[in-house]
Amino acid sequence: MSDICDANKLKHRFRGYFPVVIDVETAGFNSQTDALLEIAVTLLKMDDEGMLGIDKTLHFHIEPFEGANLEPAALAFNGIDPNNPLRGAVSEKEAFLDIFKAVKKAQKAADCHRCIIVAHNAAFDHGFVSKAIERCDLKRSPFHPFATFDTATLAGLAIGHTVLAKACMMAGIPFDNKEAHSALYDTERTAELFCYIVNRWKQLGGWPLLAAGAQDAESDTEE
């Protein structure tokens, strides 16, 4: 099979987009005012059989930006103490420079033309990521400015449940609720869920699509 029509290559699976799984932990719901406190980024790879899997994960604790709002309820929910020196937190800019470097390298290796964020309830994560990039005045973001793959939506379609923990368990992916709301843990479970859905769709015959010409030929033969 030629590279041009090789459906088992990642660059052909999502129209040239390289999926990057992201989860953030924050000090509230407002991306403009509330601090980004933790981020994890999981890179994916596709094997020779066209099956998607986890490659590696980057993880950063983030220092609240100057003047950031810290909602007590949000901190109680995720258990993060922004002032704990043991967090080893770095600035938003330092984290995103490292993230940009890693995802651009992976995107190039996969011969894709742009990265697209995969997240559970993706609008939330995409909003905080985009705002942090804007605050840091970073240019040439690898991420699509508005398009995302939302695993809550995909799981609702493929599995019948939208809650991450429940969807994972229904897909046979172990999920420990005690570990939840850690960006590192949630990102890797989200990545496993996304890979499960993509791979299951392939196994069921949904991918690759038959070319229009092949479909027409089959129709002519049947007639």
Swiss-Prot record:
The keyword tRNA processing applies. Binds two Mg(2+) per subunit. The active form of the enzyme binds two Mg(2+) ions in its active site. The first Mg(2+) forms only one salt bridge with the protein. One of its GO terms (biological process) is tRNA processing. Pfam families: RNase_T (PF00929). Mg(2+) 2 binds at residues 23, 25, 181, 186. Signal peptide: none annotated. Its cofactor is Mg(2+). Coiled coil: none annotated. Its EC number is 3.1.13.-. Belongs to the RNase T family. This is Ribonuclease T.
